[in-house]
A protein has these predicted regions:
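Positively charged n-region of N-terminal signal peptides that target proteins for export
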Residues: 1-4
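Bacterial N-terminal signal peptides
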Residues: 7-17
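Conserved functional micro-motifs across diverse proteins
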Residues: 22-191
Length: 191
């Protein structure tokens, strides 16, 4: 009986950690992480909350989606599962290669005119360190939604200096260097 109680106690101690997602974003996937991402994508077909850990909203109601390598591969597996297909090795390689070593961020910003975001400049703050993007694509012809224009912007940052566990701040500035939007990105809550 005592042995049973000890085993039960050990099981209770370790139970919350078994099967839980990794507690940090990874910018380069190993084979185990690739399989986990594919499995998560396949399972997500029946879940409406897929992608929640990679999305954020700021006080102004603007949205941000972080595309980590795990998220990209899980999304590819999800899309294949919707079609009743499995991912081919070539598809896996493509999904991993396009996001490996990068932090890709999709941001939807709101403004008064169709071209308001054209010259916006993003920067990622890691403490006091500013990380400049390697690629910026600001939408020049924003769509009108709910009386304001919504511009979908794509920003790619190098992940070489980023750990996977920190909190970062994405700051978007206008050409006059005035902050127009900020987002908190919690990498420790993402895979």
């Amino acid at each position: 009986m005592r042995r049973y109680a000890i085993l039960l106690g050990i099981g209770i101690i370790f139970w919350p950690t078994i099967g839980q997602p990794a507690a940090a974003a990874s910018f380069s996937l190993g084979e185990r992480e690739r399989q986990d991402a594919i499995a998560a994508g396949r399972r997500s077909v029946v879940s409406e909350e897929f992608g929640g850990e990679w999305r954020a909203r700021n006080a102004a109601g603007e949205t941000l989606t972080v595309m980590t390598p795990f998220h990209r591969l899980a999304l590819a597996a999800r899309n294949a599962a919707f079609k009743g297909e499995t991912l081919k090795p070539k598809d896996i390689q493509t999904a991993v290669k396009e996001t490996d070593g990068k932090l890709t961020v999709w941001v939807t910003l709101k403004g008064p005119t169709a071209d308001f975001a054209r010259f916006y400049v993003p920067v990622l703050l890691d403490g006091k360190t500013e990380i400049k993007p390697t690629f910026v694509q600001n939408e020049r012809t924003a769509l009108r939604e709910d009386g304001v224009f919504a511009a979908r912007c794509l920003y790619v940052f190098p992940a070489a200096t980023l750990g996977g566990k920190g909190r970062l701040t994405l700051v978007v500035r206008n050409p006059d260097d005035k902050e127009v939007s900020t987002f908190t990105v919690d990498l420790s809550a993402m895979r």
